[in-house]
Protein backbone atom coordinates (compact mmCIF):
# COMPACT_ATOMS: atom_id res chain seq x y z
CA UNK A 1 0.00 0.00 0.00
CA UNK A 2 1.22 3.48 -0.83
CA UNK A 3 2.11 5.30 2.43
CA UNK A 4 -0.26 8.18 1.62
CA UNK A 5 -3.26 5.90 2.20
CA UNK A 6 -2.27 4.45 5.56
CA UNK A 7 -3.87 7.04 7.86
CA UNK A 8 -7.19 7.15 5.96
CA UNK A 9 -7.24 3.37 5.59
CA UNK A 10 -6.81 2.85 9.34
CA UNK A 11 -9.97 4.88 10.01
CA UNK A 12 -12.21 2.71 7.81
CA UNK A 13 -14.55 0.07 9.20
CA UNK A 14 -12.92 -3.34 9.61
CA UNK A 15 -15.03 -5.04 6.94
CA UNK A 16 -14.23 -2.29 4.43
CA UNK A 17 -10.54 -2.52 5.30
CA UNK A 18 -10.59 -6.26 4.63
CA UNK A 19 -12.23 -5.80 1.24
CA UNK A 20 -9.98 -2.90 0.22
CA UNK A 21 -6.64 -4.32 1.37
CA UNK A 22 -5.99 -6.46 -1.73
CA UNK A 23 -7.12 -3.63 -4.01
CA UNK A 24 -4.77 -1.13 -2.40
CA UNK A 25 -1.85 -3.56 -2.23
CA UNK A 26 1.24 -2.37 -4.04
CA UNK A 27 2.66 1.09 -4.57
CA UNK A 28 0.77 1.91 -7.76
CA UNK A 29 -2.94 1.43 -7.05
CA UNK A 30 -4.54 3.17 -10.08
CA UNK A 31 -6.88 5.33 -7.96
CA UNK A 32 -9.94 3.82 -9.62
CA UNK A 33 -12.40 1.05 -8.88
CA UNK A 34 -14.05 -1.11 -11.49
CA UNK A 35 -17.81 -1.61 -11.41
CA UNK A 36 -17.19 -5.13 -10.12
CA UNK A 37 -14.98 -3.87 -7.30
CA UNK A 38 -17.57 -1.25 -6.35
CA UNK A 39 -20.24 -3.95 -6.17
CA UNK A 40 -18.02 -6.16 -4.01
CA UNK A 41 -17.23 -3.32 -1.62
CA UNK A 42 -20.91 -2.38 -1.30
CA UNK A 43 -21.89 -5.95 -0.46
CA UNK A 44 -19.01 -6.55 1.93
CA UNK A 45 -19.41 -3.29 3.82
CA UNK A 46 -23.22 -3.30 3.72
CA UNK A 47 -23.27 0.21 2.26
CA UNK A 48 -25.29 1.71 -0.55
CA UNK A 49 -23.50 3.50 -3.37
CA UNK A 50 -23.66 6.97 -1.85
CA UNK A 51 -22.50 5.83 1.59
CA UNK A 52 -19.61 3.89 0.07
CA UNK A 53 -18.47 6.92 -1.92
CA UNK A 54 -18.46 9.04 1.23
CA UNK A 55 -16.53 6.34 3.10
CA UNK A 56 -13.87 6.28 0.39
CA UNK A 57 -13.48 10.07 0.09
CA UNK A 58 -10.59 10.22 2.62
CA UNK A 59 -8.63 7.84 0.38
CA UNK A 60 -9.19 10.15 -2.57
CA UNK A 61 -8.18 13.21 -0.52
CA UNK A 62 -5.00 11.39 0.51
CA UNK A 63 -3.87 11.69 -3.12
CA UNK A 64 -3.77 15.50 -2.90
CA UNK A 65 -0.54 17.39 -3.60
CA UNK A 66 -1.00 20.59 -1.61
CA UNK A 67 2.45 21.99 -0.87
CA UNK A 68 1.04 25.52 -0.95
CA UNK A 69 -2.38 25.42 0.73
CA UNK A 70 -2.09 22.22 2.79
CA UNK A 71 -5.84 21.91 2.19
CA UNK A 72 -6.65 18.47 0.81
CA UNK A 73 -9.78 18.03 -1.28
CA UNK A 74 -10.86 14.63 -2.56
CA UNK A 75 -13.43 13.75 -5.19
CA UNK A 76 -14.84 10.58 -6.72
CA UNK A 77 -16.29 10.68 -10.21
CA UNK A 78 -18.84 7.92 -10.77
CA UNK A 79 -18.94 6.86 -14.38
CA UNK A 80 -21.99 5.65 -16.28
CA UNK A 81 -19.97 2.45 -16.78
CA UNK A 82 -20.10 1.83 -13.03
CA UNK A 83 -16.39 2.53 -12.62
CA UNK A 84 -15.28 5.05 -10.00
CA UNK A 85 -12.36 7.43 -10.41
CA UNK A 86 -10.51 9.18 -7.57
CA UNK A 87 -9.35 12.76 -7.83
CA UNK A 88 -7.58 15.26 -5.60
CA UNK A 89 -6.27 18.80 -5.83
CA UNK A 90 -2.73 19.45 -7.05
CA UNK A 91 -0.52 22.50 -6.56
CA UNK A 92 2.87 23.02 -8.16
CA UNK A 93 5.52 24.93 -6.23
CA UNK A 94 7.73 27.03 -8.46
CA UNK A 95 5.04 27.32 -11.13
CA UNK A 96 2.00 29.63 -10.99
CA UNK A 97 -1.28 29.33 -9.15
CA UNK A 98 -3.04 29.09 -12.53
CA UNK A 99 -1.47 25.65 -13.02
CA UNK A 100 -3.44 24.24 -10.06
CA UNK A 101 -5.71 21.24 -10.62
CA UNK A 102 -8.89 21.21 -8.54
CA UNK A 103 -10.15 17.93 -7.09
CA UNK A 104 -13.25 17.81 -9.28
CA UNK A 105 -11.13 18.51 -12.36
CA UNK A 106 -8.77 15.78 -11.24
CA UNK A 107 -11.48 13.13 -10.87
CA UNK A 108 -13.28 14.14 -14.07
CA UNK A 109 -10.17 14.28 -16.25
CA UNK A 110 -9.07 10.98 -14.69
CA UNK A 111 -12.33 9.39 -15.83
CA UNK A 112 -12.14 10.99 -19.28
CA UNK A 113 -8.55 9.96 -19.92
CA UNK A 114 -9.38 6.38 -18.94
CA UNK A 115 -12.07 6.28 -21.62
CA UNK A 116 -15.19 6.86 -19.52
CA UNK A 117 -18.07 8.05 -21.73
CA UNK A 118 -20.06 10.03 -19.17
CA UNK A 119 -20.59 10.70 -15.47
CA UNK A 120 -23.58 10.00 -13.28
CA UNK A 121 -22.34 11.74 -10.13
CA UNK A 122 -19.43 13.44 -8.41
CA UNK A 123 -18.85 13.00 -4.68
CA UNK A 124 -16.61 15.60 -3.06
CA UNK A 125 -15.71 16.49 0.52
CA UNK A 126 -16.08 20.28 0.14
CA UNK A 127 -18.51 22.45 -1.80
CA UNK A 128 -17.33 22.83 -5.41
CA UNK A 129 -15.95 26.28 -6.13
CA UNK A 130 -17.31 28.35 -9.00
CA UNK A 131 -14.36 27.32 -11.17
CA UNK A 132 -15.26 23.64 -10.79
CA UNK A 133 -18.97 24.19 -11.29
CA UNK A 134 -18.17 25.85 -14.60
CA UNK A 135 -15.74 23.07 -15.51
CA UNK A 136 -18.43 20.45 -14.88
CA UNK A 137 -20.87 22.32 -17.11
CA UNK A 138 -18.72 21.39 -20.11
CA UNK A 139 -19.52 17.68 -19.59
CA UNK A 140 -21.94 15.72 -21.73
CA UNK A 141 -23.90 14.99 -18.53
CA UNK A 142 -24.71 18.70 -18.42
CA UNK A 143 -26.65 20.26 -15.59
CA UNK A 144 -28.18 16.90 -14.62
CA UNK A 145 -24.91 15.71 -13.09
CA UNK A 146 -25.52 14.77 -9.43
CA UNK A 147 -23.26 16.30 -6.80
CA UNK A 148 -22.94 14.66 -3.39
CA UNK A 149 -21.52 16.46 -0.35
CA UNK A 150 -21.19 15.15 3.23
CA UNK A 151 -24.12 16.10 5.43
CA UNK A 152 -26.26 17.41 2.57
CA UNK A 153 -28.92 15.99 0.32
CA UNK A 154 -27.68 15.33 -3.21
CA UNK A 155 -28.32 18.08 -5.74
CA UNK A 156 -27.74 18.46 -9.44
CA UNK A 157 -25.23 20.78 -11.04
CA UNK A 158 -28.24 22.87 -12.08
CA UNK A 159 -28.83 23.64 -8.39
CA UNK A 160 -25.21 24.71 -7.90
CA UNK A 161 -24.98 26.66 -11.15
CA UNK A 162 -28.27 28.49 -11.76
CA UNK A 163 -28.64 30.59 -14.91
CA UNK A 164 -25.63 28.73 -16.25
CA UNK A 165 -23.49 29.80 -19.19
CA UNK A 166 -22.01 26.91 -21.11
CA UNK A 167 -21.17 25.33 -24.44
CA UNK A 168 -24.77 25.31 -25.63
CA UNK A 169 -24.80 29.11 -25.48
CA UNK A 170 -21.97 29.04 -28.02
CA UNK A 171 -23.74 26.41 -30.14
CA UNK A 172 -21.17 23.74 -29.31
CA UNK A 173 -22.61 20.28 -29.89
CA UNK A 174 -19.65 18.02 -29.05
CA UNK A 175 -19.06 18.10 -25.30
CA UNK A 176 -16.36 16.97 -22.92
CA UNK A 177 -16.36 13.15 -22.65
CA UNK A 178 -17.98 12.74 -26.06
CA UNK A 179 -15.93 10.59 -28.44
CA UNK A 180 -13.45 12.71 -30.40
CA UNK A 181 -10.61 11.85 -32.79
CA UNK A 182 -8.98 14.65 -34.73
CA UNK A 183 -7.15 12.26 -37.00
CA UNK A 184 -3.52 13.35 -36.74
CA UNK A 185 -1.17 10.67 -38.05
CA UNK A 186 0.88 8.79 -35.48
CA UNK A 187 4.62 9.18 -36.10
CA UNK A 188 7.83 8.79 -34.13
CA UNK A 189 8.62 6.58 -31.17
CA UNK A 190 6.20 5.21 -28.59
CA UNK A 191 6.20 8.32 -26.40
CA UNK A 192 5.72 10.64 -29.36
CA UNK A 193 2.82 8.55 -30.62
CA UNK A 194 1.27 8.63 -27.14
CA UNK A 195 1.40 12.44 -27.16
CA UNK A 196 -0.19 12.59 -30.63
CA UNK A 197 -2.90 10.14 -29.57
CA UNK A 198 -3.65 12.38 -26.58
CA UNK A 199 -3.86 15.42 -28.86
CA UNK A 200 -6.30 13.56 -31.10
CA UNK A 201 -8.62 13.24 -28.10
CA UNK A 202 -8.55 16.97 -27.27
CA UNK A 203 -11.75 18.88 -26.54
CA UNK A 204 -10.97 22.27 -28.07
CA UNK A 205 -14.07 23.63 -29.85
CA UNK A 206 -13.27 27.27 -29.00
CA UNK A 207 -9.65 27.71 -30.09
CA UNK A 208 -9.29 24.71 -32.43
CA UNK A 209 -5.83 24.24 -30.91
CA UNK A 210 -5.32 20.52 -30.20
CA UNK A 211 -2.57 19.43 -27.85
CA UNK A 212 -1.49 16.41 -25.87
CA UNK A 213 1.30 15.56 -23.44
CA UNK A 214 3.00 12.24 -22.77
CA UNK A 215 5.23 11.65 -19.75
CA UNK A 216 7.60 8.69 -19.53
CA UNK A 217 8.67 7.46 -16.10
CA UNK A 218 12.00 5.84 -15.31
CA UNK A 219 10.34 2.42 -15.14
CA UNK A 220 8.91 2.88 -18.65
CA UNK A 221 5.34 3.70 -17.61
CA UNK A 222 3.70 6.37 -19.79
CA UNK A 223 0.98 8.81 -18.72
CA UNK A 224 -0.82 11.11 -21.13
CA UNK A 225 -2.99 14.19 -20.88
CA UNK A 226 -5.36 15.75 -23.40
CA UNK A 227 -6.33 19.40 -23.67
CA UNK A 228 -9.83 20.14 -22.29
CA UNK A 229 -11.27 23.57 -23.09
CA UNK A 230 -14.14 25.27 -21.33
CA UNK A 231 -16.78 27.69 -22.60
CA UNK A 232 -15.69 30.16 -19.91
CA UNK A 233 -12.03 29.76 -21.01
CA UNK A 234 -10.34 30.08 -17.59
CA UNK A 235 -11.48 26.68 -16.24
CA UNK A 236 -9.75 25.04 -19.23
CA UNK A 237 -7.43 22.17 -18.22
CA UNK A 238 -4.07 22.07 -20.05
CA UNK A 239 -2.76 18.71 -21.28
CA UNK A 240 0.22 18.69 -18.93
CA UNK A 241 -2.06 18.90 -15.91
CA UNK A 242 -4.04 15.90 -17.15
CA UNK A 243 -0.87 13.85 -17.50
CA UNK A 244 0.60 14.96 -14.15
CA UNK A 245 -2.72 14.18 -12.50
CA UNK A 246 -2.71 10.59 -13.79
CA UNK A 247 0.93 10.15 -12.86
CA UNK A 248 0.35 11.32 -9.30
CA UNK A 249 -2.89 9.39 -8.81
CA UNK A 250 -1.04 6.23 -9.82
CA UNK A 251 1.48 6.71 -7.03
CA UNK A 252 4.37 8.19 -9.01
CA UNK A 253 6.28 11.35 -8.12
CA UNK A 254 7.59 14.13 -10.32
CA UNK A 255 11.13 12.86 -9.83
CA UNK A 256 10.07 9.67 -11.64
CA UNK A 257 9.61 11.57 -14.93
CA UNK A 258 12.53 11.01 -17.29
CA UNK A 259 11.11 12.44 -20.51
CA UNK A 260 8.17 14.54 -21.68
CA UNK A 261 6.70 15.29 -25.10
CA UNK A 262 4.13 17.91 -26.08
CA UNK A 263 2.21 17.47 -29.35
CA UNK A 264 0.55 20.57 -30.79
CA UNK A 265 0.17 22.57 -33.99
CA UNK A 266 2.89 25.12 -34.62
CA UNK A 267 0.44 27.63 -36.07
CA UNK A 268 -2.35 27.12 -33.53
CA UNK A 269 -4.18 30.08 -32.03
CA UNK A 270 -3.06 28.92 -28.58
CA UNK A 271 0.38 27.46 -27.86
CA UNK A 272 1.11 25.24 -24.84
CA UNK A 273 4.89 24.97 -25.21
CA UNK A 274 6.13 27.77 -22.95
CA UNK A 275 3.77 27.01 -20.05
CA UNK A 276 4.35 23.26 -20.38
CA UNK A 277 8.13 23.56 -20.40
CA UNK A 278 8.17 26.07 -17.54
CA UNK A 279 5.99 23.90 -15.30
CA UNK A 280 7.94 20.72 -16.03
CA UNK A 281 11.25 22.47 -15.33
CA UNK A 282 9.84 23.74 -12.02
CA UNK A 283 9.11 20.10 -11.18
CA UNK A 284 12.63 18.99 -12.11
CA UNK A 285 12.08 17.60 -15.62
CA UNK A 286 14.35 19.13 -18.29
CA UNK A 287 14.15 16.43 -20.98
CA UNK A 288 11.23 18.00 -22.85
CA UNK A 289 10.49 17.74 -26.56
CA UNK A 290 7.82 19.09 -28.87
CA UNK A 291 6.29 17.42 -31.92
CA UNK A 292 4.25 19.47 -34.36
CA UNK A 293 0.94 18.11 -35.55
CA UNK A 294 0.44 18.26 -39.30
Curated annotation (Swiss-Prot):
Keywords: Hydrolase, Metal-binding, Zinc. GO terms for biological process: cytidine deamination. Zn(2+) binds at residues 102, 129, 132. It catalyses: cytidine + H2O + H(+) = uridine + NH4(+); 2'-deoxycytidine + H2O + H(+) = 2'-deoxyuridine + NH4(+). Residues 48-168, 186-294 form the CMP/dCMP-type deaminase domain. One of its GO terms (molecular function) is zinc ion binding. Its EC number is 3.5.4.5. This enzyme scavenges exogenous and endogenous cytidine and 2'-deoxycytidine for UMP synthesis. This is Cytidine deaminase. It comes from Salmonella choleraesuis (strain SC-B67). The lineage of its organism: Bacteria, Pseudomonadati, Pseudomonadota, Gammaproteobacteria, Enterobacterales.
Amino acid sequence: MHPRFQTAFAQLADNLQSALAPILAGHHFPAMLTAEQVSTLKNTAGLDEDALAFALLPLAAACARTDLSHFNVGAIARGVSGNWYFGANMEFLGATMQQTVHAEQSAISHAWLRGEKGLAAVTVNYTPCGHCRQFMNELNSGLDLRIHLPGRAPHTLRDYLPDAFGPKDLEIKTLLMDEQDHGFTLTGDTLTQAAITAANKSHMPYSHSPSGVALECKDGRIFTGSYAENAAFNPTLPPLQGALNLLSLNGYDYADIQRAILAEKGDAALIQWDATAATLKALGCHNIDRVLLG
